[in-house]
Structures are given as C-alpha cells and as structure tokens.
Swiss-Prot record:
Enzyme class (EC, first level): transferase
Domain of life: Bacteria
Gene encoding the protein: tpm
Record's subcellular location: Cytoplasm
Source organism (scientific name): Nitrosomonas eutropha (strain DSM 101675 / C91 / Nm57)
Primary localization: cytoplasm
Name assigned to this protein: Thiopurine S-methyltransferase
Keyword Cell cycle belongs to the record: no
Signal peptide: none
Lineage: Bacteria, Pseudomonadati, Pseudomonadota, Betaproteobacteria, Nitrosomonadales
Keyword Translocase tagged: no
Pfam family membership, one: TPMT
PROSITE patterns: SAM_MT_TPMT (PS51585)
Catalytic activity: S-adenosyl-L-methionine + a thiopurine = S-adenosyl-L-homocysteine + a thiopurine S-methylether
GO molecular function, one term: thiopurine S-methyltransferase activity
Assigned protein family: Belongs to the class I-like SAM-binding methyltransferase superfamily. TPMT family.
Length: 220
C-alpha cells in the first residue's frame, strides 16, 4: 500500500473498507486467547475501526498505529473522546482512556515500543500491503513483539488477477510461510463472504473468502 493512496482515500472519503460494525470473528475468537484484562493489544493500521473500541470495552489497553490523521481524529470524535496529544519520534500520540493511537508510519515502530504488548489484532494491515512489503512487515515489525504474544490475523482470499488491491488476497500458504518459524499459526475458520460483499462482486470478483488465524509468538 502506498502512503499517498491511503491518505488520499481518507481525504476523498473513499473508505468503503471501513466496517460499520465490530468484526464478528474478533468477538467470536478473541475470548479464546484468554488474555488477562489490562493486557496491551497492538492494532496496526487501525483506520477508525470499531474493533478498537470493542477491545477497550473488554478491559484491554489498545495501542494502535494509523497513517491518516483524518482517520485518527474521526475515531476519537465518533466515540465522544477528547484525546491528550503528544509528540514522539514514532509520530503523534492520541490517548483517551485506555486507547492510544499513534498517527505515524507503522514501519517506524520498534521493540522499545512494542515489547510490553501481550496481544496483536491484525484485520487490516497485512491485506493492505502488496507482496513486496508483507515480508518486511512480518520480519521487521512483528518480530518486535515479545515471545508469548498472541492474537488474531484476519485475511481475504480471492483470485488476485480479478481485482487490483488493496485489499490484497493473502492465501494460507503465504501466511504459514511468512510467519514461520517465529510464529505458531493456526487456521481457525474460513468463510465464503462474496454474497455479503456486493461491492467486491461489482469490482469483478467471482469468489471471496475471509480466513482468521490464531497467532502465537515463539521464542525464536
């Protein structure tokens, strides 16, 4: 995903990727991770996702990162929150209650920031990246998370030649290859969702599935 494409999408209101409800797969599978209340959860490329508010409502501390200032501002405004704002070398931090969102580049984060995260929730980051950026994302960013960190990864699967991403198709074989050997990856569920996504059908897709994986960071 090019920075300019993402920023322009928010500026022009082309945010059809934003879900107007909490992701059902998050609600279904997050409790199975059995993470203690108060754990810090890392959410990359947040947009203004309602999933952050849901995680916070479960008692978790949310640490998100988002490139678009508009997305960050809209998230807090739409939840009636007035965040405290501070600057760091990571970007601009917006914090209200138990939610902190850094407006900055996801690839600028490091282990010093992420070493106390017990969980990871990726619904939008991996599928937003073209193939050439997925391995750096996993090798350079995901390895900053500590051993024992667990979470969920949600992907889309379709015939890539039928549509220009983002979002991109990321098949199970690629997930397993990219996350190995530093992560234990388990497929939890895969569903055909094209009937519920007419917008993707209109873009030419003949098949569309979503898959959810459980991730566990290994001491490697």
């Amino acid at each position: 995903m090019e920075h300019e494409f993402w920023l322009q999408s928010w500026h022009e209101g082309r945010t059809g990727f934003h879900q107007l409800r909490v992701q059902p797969l998050l609600q279904k599978y997050w409790p199975t991770l059995d993470l203690p209340t108060g754990s810090k959860i890392f959410v990359p490329l947040t947009g203004k996702s309602l999933d952050m508010a849901w995680l916070a409502a479960q008692g978790y501390r949310v640490l998100g990162v988002e490139l678009s200032l508009l997305a960050v501002q809209q998230f807090f405004a739409e939840h009636g929150l007035k965040p405290a704002v501070r600057e760091s070398h990571y970007g601009t931090h917006y914090t209200a209650r138990n939610i902190e969102v850094i407006c900055g580049d996801t690839f600028a984060l490091d282990a010093a920031l992420l070493s106390d995260c017990s969980g990871i929730y990726d619904r939008a980051a991996l599928i937003a990246l073209p193939p050439e950026l997925r391995v750096p994302y996993i090798n350079e960013l995901m390895t900053c998370l500590p051993a024992g960190c667990s979470g969920l990864l949600i992907t889309l699967e379709y015939q890539q030649q039928e549509m220009v991403g983002p979002p991109f198709s990321v098949e199970e074989a690629e997930v397993l290859k990219c996350y190995s050997p530093r992560w234990c990856v388990k497929l939890l569920e895969r569903n055909d969702i094209l009937p519920q996504e007419p917008g993707f059908a209109a873009r030419g897709l003949t098949k569309l599935a979503t898959a959810v994986y459980q991730l566990q960071r290994l001491a490697v």
